[in-house]
């Protein structure tokens, strides 16, 4: 599933976990407020609070789509930022 930046801004920060899977250099040069920086692989191996939406951000959207889909298959309410 996709979520727009505008939709994300409307959510209460307590409702979601924002995960930045861009490469570490890009993530630290241009940090996204309230995000956790992780690799796509490590996201798939972690456990998250299942009561929250999981929002995935990457540089172009392709990898975040894949990671969000895999998290959905594991039962999470996961989204890729469009």
Predicted regions and their residues:
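Glycine-rich nucleotide phosphate-binding loop and flanking beta-alpha elements
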Residues: 25, 44, 62-64
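Short loop/edge segments at beta-strand edges and connector loops
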Residues: 3-5, 39-40, 82
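Short amphipathic alpha-helix with an adjacent loop that forms part of the alpha/beta core around
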Residues: 9-11, 41-50
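Catalytic cysteine-centered active loop of the rhodanese-like fold, especially the PTP/DSP P-loop
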Residues: 48-82
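Active-site regions of enzymes building and remodeling cell-envelope glycoconjugates
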Residues: 32-38, 51-54
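Short loop/helix-cap segments at secondary-structure boundaries that form the rim of catalytic
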Residues: 27-33, 45-49
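Flexible, polar/low-complexity N-terminal or interdomain linker segments that lie immediately upstream
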Residues: 1-30, 76
């Amino acid at each position: 599933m996709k979520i727009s930046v505008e939709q994300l801004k409307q959510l209460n920060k307590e409702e979601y976990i924002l995960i930045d899977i861009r490469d570490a250099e890009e993530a630290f040069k241009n940090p996204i407020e309230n995000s956790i920086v992780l690799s796509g692989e490590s996201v798939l191996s972690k456990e998250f609070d299942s009561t929250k939406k999981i929002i995935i951000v990457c540089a172009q959207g392709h990898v975040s789509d894949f990671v969000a889909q895999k998290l959905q298959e594991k039962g999470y309410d996961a989204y890729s930022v469009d």
